[in-house]
Amino acid sequence: MAEAITIARPYAEAVFRLAQGSGSLSLWSEMLGIVSSVIQESQVNALIGNPQIPSIKLREIVFSICDKELNEDGRRLISLLIENGRLLVLPQISELYEQLKAQHESVLEAEIVSAFPLESYQLEKLISVLEVKFQHKVKAQVSVDSGLIGGVKIEIGDQVIDSSVSGKLEAMAATLKS
């Protein structure tokens, strides 16, 4: 995994610079997302890993599936990745690109896990509090984990805010043991 990220980083940075220069950040997000999902399909993934399939044929297959979604620069990127045997790292390129884009747009990704489904007004209030605290726009991924018993656990950047009942119980247990 770390090796794939290391390989993907220069590609992601180059794509980001290209997208930023041409003002097409959102377009590149869409293109990378679409092609990433296509190559993660098991049938396409098997073709990519097959050494008997020449790169020209692989390029034809990928373009036949998602050519309408790609602009000329997108096609060049896919061709380059195929020629260099790096097409399988496209999901990591997409992930790193999204991180660079979010950083550029001053958007922080937050993962919010709650014990119960949050109402829309609760989520909006929570996001607005996080935006004030971190002084950035916050984009939230929300999930439910009944194991928290109550409350929420928020991961944003490298910080964790655990205001769940299970988190408080674990903290009390650790205090009592010491």
Curated annotation (Swiss-Prot):
Protein localization: Cell inner membrane
Membrane topology annotation: Peripheral membrane protein
InterPro entries reported in the protein's UniProt record: ATP_synth_OSCP/delta_N_sf, ATPase_OSCP/dsu
Pfam families reported in the protein's UniProt record: OSCP (PF00213)
SUPFAM superfamilies attached to this UniProt entry: N-terminal domain of the delta subunit of the F1F0-ATP synthase
Keyword Cell membrane annotated: yes
Keywords, in A-Z order: ATP synthesis, Cell inner membrane, Cell membrane, CF(1), Hydrogen ion transport, Ion transport, Membrane, Transport
GO molecular function: proton-transporting ATP synthase activity, rotational mechanism
Cellular component GO terms, alphabetical: plasma membrane; proton-transporting ATP synthase complex
Function: F(1)F(0) ATP synthase produces ATP from ADP in the presence of a proton or sodium gradient. F-type ATPases consist of two structural domains, F(1) containing the extramembraneous catalytic core and F(0) containing the membrane proton channel, linked together by a central stalk and a peripheral stalk. During catalysis, ATP synthesis in the catalytic domain of F(1) is coupled via a rotary mechanism of the central stalk subunits to proton translocation. This protein is part of the stalk that links CF(0) to CF(1). It either transmits conformational changes from CF(0) to CF(1) or is implicated in proton conduction.
Subunit architecture: F-type ATPases have 2 components, F(1) - the catalytic core - and F(0) - the membrane proton channel. F(1) has five subunits: alpha(3), beta(3), gamma(1), delta(1), epsilon(1). F(0) has three main subunits: a(1), b(2) and c(10-14). The alpha and beta chains form an alternating ring which encloses part of the gamma chain. F(1) is attached to F(0) by a central stalk formed by the gamma and epsilon chains, while a peripheral stalk is formed by the delta and b chains.
UniProt cross-references to NCBIfam families, sorted A to Z: ATP_synt_delta, PRK05758.2-2
Family membership: Belongs to the ATPase delta chain family.
Protein name, per record: ATP synthase subunit delta
Provenance organism: Nitrosomonas eutropha (strain DSM 101675 / C91 / Nm57)
The encoding gene: atpH
